[in-house]
Amino acid sequence: MPKIRIRTSDKLFSQWIRIRDGRCLRCGSSVKFNNSGLPISHNASHFQGRGKENTRFNPDNVCTLCYGCHSYFTAHPAEHTLWQVERLGQKKVDEIVFWSNQYKKRDDKLEAMLWKQELTKLQDKRKV
């Protein structure tokens, strides 16, 4: 399977997710931040992978996991699904899976603009 290219919008969205959560949602370890307030640890983990454009930037589809928990769920996808059901509920998981299988045309510039704006809002909120 070809490697998914990481776009500017992915990087912005990843930062937004890790700031939003502030910790690994499985084990609770805290995200570390640099002097600019940007996250420098943990992963923004996609339940339905980045290759699924329709849910690639869906905040419900992505959560913060530390490297250990992310690796564990990558190796144990059935347990990842069960954990997501516990976290979000069966209805939300079913919605994410459904939408992940629908077609969506990409607009990289629009996604990057949106997530840059959302990231700035979230960073400003953290400073207060």
Where are these regions (language model features)?
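Short, charged surface segments at domain edges that flank catalytic/cofactor-binding sites
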Residues: 1-23, 105-106
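Conserved aromatic-histidine-acidic binding/catalytic patches
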Residues: 5, 9, 54, 72
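Histidine-centered nuclease catalytic patch
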Residues: 25-62
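Short Cys/His-centered divalent metal-binding micro-motifs
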Residues: 29-33, 62-86
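Glycine-centered helix-coil hinge/cap
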Residues: 85-93
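Short flanking/linker segments adjacent to small metal-binding domains or redox-active Cys/His motifs
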Residues: 93-128
